[in-house]
């Protein structure tokens, strides 16, 4: 089973590489500070709205962030549901 890596971890690295704080990024993205500061801390996911804002500010693909978030969400769900589904759902 793959290890779940929250996309906020990669955002934290990106911010560090650009010497940019999460609060400053929030200001530049036009969103409340908490919406961004919670992402690197793993307390909030990256929404489609944020992906498009990151695309404009960081020149990254919105699909990059969306794919990271989806992969993380699926991995976490699999970890939570895996055993139960093996018992409850019959394989084809």
Language-model-detected regions and their locations in the chain:
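Short, charged amphipathic recognition helices of the HTH superfamily
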Residues: 20-24, 47
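Recognition helix of helix-turn-helix/homeodomain-like DNA-binding domains
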Residues: 30-46, 53-55
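Key DNA-contact positions within bacterial/archaeal DNA-binding proteins
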Residues: 23, 34, 63
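DNA major-groove recognition helix of helix-turn-helix/homeodomain DNA-binding modules
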Residues: 49-69
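Short, charged recognition helix plus adjacent turn
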Residues: 66-92
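A short, Lys/Arg-rich alpha-helix, primarily the initiator
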Residues: 1-20, 67
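Short polybasic/polar patches that bind polyanions
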Residues: 16, 27, 56
């Amino acid at each position: 089973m793959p290890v779940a890596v929250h996309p906020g971890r990669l955002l934290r690295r990106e911010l560090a590489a650009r010497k940019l704080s999460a609060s400053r990024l929030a200001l530049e993205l036009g969103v409340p500070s908490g919406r961004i500061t919670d992402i690197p801390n793993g307390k909030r996911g990256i929404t489609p709205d944020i992906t498009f804002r990151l695309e404009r500010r960081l020149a990254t693909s919105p699909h990059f962030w969306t794919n990271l978030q989806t992969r993380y969400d699926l991995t976490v769900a699999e970890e939570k549901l895996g055993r139960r589904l093996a018992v409850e759902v019959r394989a084809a």
